[in-house]
Amino acid sequence: MAKKKPFMYMSTNEWLGDPVTHFMKTGNALRSDENDELANISNLIPKIANGVKIEYDISYESPKDRIHGYKYTDLLTKVVMISPCNSTISVQNLINAIKKEPTEEGLAVVAKIKANLTDKYLLDEESDLPVKDLIILPGTNLLTKEGGWCDMEKIDKLVEEGAYVKLHPITAKVWQTMLMKRWGDKCINNDVALYPLLKKCDKAYFCMSSETGLSATLLGKKIGLIDLKERKGRGTFEHVYNALDRCGVKDTLYNKLAALFSHPESGFVCIYHDNYQERIDKYFAHMKETYKHKE
């Protein structure tokens, strides 16, 4: 089972690497030490830039023509992604970076990320199931949020055709019971490590709230979505997937993703980059010069 943490008081200032912040977000799902180096990046991110606040993992929408705030989140245990709280600007900004094409540095960075992909959470078990099609569910919060984000009928059909469903580490006990009953031996428990399964599958299905599609892209897997076509809200990584899809660049998804790690204007900062502060400063300078902000 996932290891448990002691009781902690609520955080009054959420920040990457803060144990209380992560406890309130993930409960008893303990984050792996593989995430620890990210603090070397997040500690350099200012609380305010271009006259607006920067917050960890908090999402909202600004008016379409300007930025009222920024958010940042961690992904793949090696990356901090900074983006404006404005989906239209977020997508366009990433498209502009992708069109610049990948550099040698960007390609080297994604190669290192690929070589070191690992689970974000400490999980106890590995599975030797013969998984070809793997469905990766989001946490309980998105299974239940405003009617749910997943197309459960599509998942049922995929399971009938032989797909396995991997439960998210943050899955409530009652949902574990319901989903195990629904999909039987095709349902993989939340305590089972994801990446050994992802590395051997042929195709991965995911929601746009999940970073898993980026992992699958790096691993050269076929990908598919399980999002409901009509749902409220936007996924954490939805602007990234939309930019990769809509950029109009005729190249592999791998190289498009490498382009985001090539140019600091994208807001992607990885532990394998040489100068974190320079990338952060260039990003906010670019955003100030290119887009309107709240006055």
Positions of predicted regions on the chain:
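Short, charged/polar "capping" segments at the starts of alpha-helices
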Residues: 15-20, 61-63, 143-145, 171-178, ...
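A donor-sugar binding/catalytic signature common to diverse glycosyltransferases
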Residues: 192-239
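Catalytic donor nucleotide-activated moiety binding site of glycosyltransferases and closely related
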Residues: 6-14, 136, 153-190
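Short loop/turn segments at strand-loop or loop-helix junctions that form parts
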Residues: 9-14, 56-60, 132-142, 167-169, ...
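Leloir-type glycosyltransferase catalytic cores
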Residues: 78-125, 233-295
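Catalytic phosphate/metal-binding cores of nucleic-acid and nucleotide-processing enzymes, i.e., regions
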Residues: 121-131, 184-187, 191, 229-231
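Phosphate/adenylate-binding glycine loop and adjacent helical scaffold
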Residues: 65-76
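N-terminal pre-catalytic "stem/leader" segment of glycosyltransferase-like enzymes
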Residues: 1-52, 141-143, 148, 282-295
